[in-house]
Amino acid sequence: MKIAAIIPSRYGSTRFAGKPLAPIAGIPMIQRVYDQVKQAICVTDIAVATDDRRIVEAVTRFGGNALMTSAACRSGTDRAAEAAKQMGLAPEDIVVNIQGDQPLIAPQTIDETLAPLLSDPDLGMTTAAFAIMDKQEITNPKDVKMVFDADGFALYFSRSPIPFARDKDTRFDTFKHLGIYAYTRRFLDIFTQLPNGVLEEIEKLEQLRALEHSHRIKTVVTRYDSPEVDIPEDIPRIEAMMASMAAD
C-alpha cells in the first residue's frame, strides 16, 4: 500500500501572490513544507500539485517531485485528487493532503493523522486538531475551530469560537483545526464528487461538505501546532518561531 503526501500549491493568491515561493529564512516556503513532509515515517511518496510552472521549476530545483494539475481545480482537495490519479494510486492507497502554507508542519502530526486509517480500513477520512494556547486565535476567523464527539469524530468546524461557554467560569480547551487531511483514495474520489454544502458555502470550509453529506471525519489531537502563512506579515512570526525552536 502506498501512502502519498500531496501538497497542493497555488501561485495566485489575492492576499499573498507567489506565496509558495516566498523565502522563509532564505528558503522557499514550499521547500520548507516539503522538507518537513519528507521526515514523516509512514509516507512513501511525495508530490507538490500545482497549476503554475514557476512552482514546478522551484520544486525541481531543490530535487522535489511536482505535478502539473488543472487551473480549473476548485480547491486543494480537487487538486490532490487529480494528482492522486496522475500518480496511479489504488483505491486502498492513502492520500495525505497537506496545505502548502504550513512550513512548520510536524512530521509526527502527519504520522498521527494517518494512524487511524492504517488501523481501521473502514474509515475514509481523518484530520488533526491542536488545543489552542494563544487565546487570540479563538476569536480570529482565519483560525478554524472544531469540536468532536467522545469517539473523536468531528461534529463541526467553524471560524467562530466553538463551543460557546454560557457560564464564563467554565474551563475547557478550544481546538484549532490544522490544515492536514488523510483519506483513502477511494473516499477522496467520493468526496470530490459531492455537491457543495450550504454550511460549506457559509463558512467557506470544504471539510464541512463531508459532514453535510453524513460522512465521518476522525480527528487526532496532536501536541504540535502548525501555524499557517496567510499574509506576508506572517513570515517574520514564523521565522521567529524557527529561531526559538533552533535555540532550544
UniProtKB/Swiss-Prot annotation:
EC numbers: 2.7.7.38
Keyword terms: Cytoplasm, Lipopolysaccharide biosynthesis, Nucleotidyltransferase, Transferase
GO cellular component: cytosol
Xref: InterPro entries: Cytidylyl_trans, KdsB, Nucleotide-diphossugar_trans
Family of this protein: Belongs to the KdsB family.
Protein task: Activates KDO (a required 8-carbon sugar) for incorporation into bacterial lipopolysaccharide in Gram-negative bacteria.
Name assigned to this protein: 3-deoxy-manno-octulosonate cytidylyltransferase
